[in-house]
Amino acid sequence: DANKEKKNKKFDFSVIGGPHYSSDTKFGLGLVAAGLYRTDRNDSLLPPSNVSLYGDVSTVGFYLLGVRGNHLFPQDKYRLNYNLYFYSFPSLYWGRGYDNGANSDNESDYKRFQAQVKVDFMFRLAKNFYIGPMAIFDYIDGRDFDKPELWEGMAARTTNTSLGLSLLYDSRDFLTNASHGYYLRIDQRFSPAFLGNKYAFSSTELTTSYYQPVWKGGVLAGQFHTLLTYGDTPWGLMATLGSSYSMRGYYEGRYRDKGAMDAQIELRQHVWKRNGVAVWAGAGTIFPRLSEFTPKHILPNYGFGYRWEFKKRVRS
């Protein structure tokens, strides 16, 4: 049974795949292969490390392949976090800024290919507190623009190499599907011209989450996220709203600018065996700079969904 943790196995591995439908990618077939392992099997307090291979194809020509994971060294003294992926997607673009995103007449087609490699290595300074360097490589290629004027003269293809520093406080009980604890991470990223970047910019990203059991099978989860970029930020690396984790239902990238901010509160309820449900409410906005944040541009978000736990403490 993939939903039972196999502590006697050095590497607990499971695979799940199936059809899906969304308004963006239409009908598709997704696959996730997830593994859990412990670097010190005698340490019951050390959370398991994890690795996932994920892929997707759909009827509109979308394809995705990637691998991500968190490797926790013995005694949790160090952490290696990584995410590598590439995808191709017939996408939509509205331009930069709130007004462009809110204007439905700006909707334009283009083809997008993107690849990213992101790695960080964290050193533990104190209980639950880590610091370490990170490196990011991005390649973004846009083609066949329906309305090229919306790109405002920016290059369709960009290659970007970044170095940075991460600060982390993490008291979650489980990295992939927490039921209690705090998570706070600050990433400071630098993309200078001397690394070969055509667009020199920097960014500051803050992600914080809180998890609290409320009753049997129920977990209250709160999240706040902001991404601020400075300098000559390329279109493909601007802050955006919309993902499978926050501001769900908004087309990812419709609202994009040099800064974005969103918050969400979610109630998760285990129902039966692997099945669960969730309801959430949140809000988000974008802005060219933090000083130009305006409440009238805040977008609401709310809904409910189904949660499937195909592996113990790993949701699909």
Show the residue positions of the predicted features.
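C-terminal beta-signal and terminal closure region of outer-membrane beta-barrel proteins
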Residues: 294-316
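Short loop/turn motifs that connect adjacent beta-strands in outer-membrane beta-barrel proteins
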Residues: 2-11, 39-48, 74-79, 127-128, ...
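Transmembrane beta-strands of outer-membrane beta-barrel pores
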Residues: 21-23, 35-37, 55-61, 71-73, ...
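Outer-membrane beta-barrel proteins
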Residues: 28, 42, 78, 89-95, ...
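Residues on the lipid-exposed face of transmembrane beta-strands in outer-membrane beta-barrel proteins
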Residues: 17-19, 31-35, 67-71, 117-123, ...
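C-terminal outer-membrane beta-barrel translocator/porin domains of Gram-negative envelope proteins
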Residues: 163-168, 172-272, 277-280, 287-288
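Gram-negative/organellar outer-membrane beta-barrel architecture
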Residues: 5-14, 20-155, 159, 254-257, ...
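Flexible, surface-exposed loop regions and adjacent strand-edge segments
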Residues: 87, 97-103, 148-154, 203-205, ...
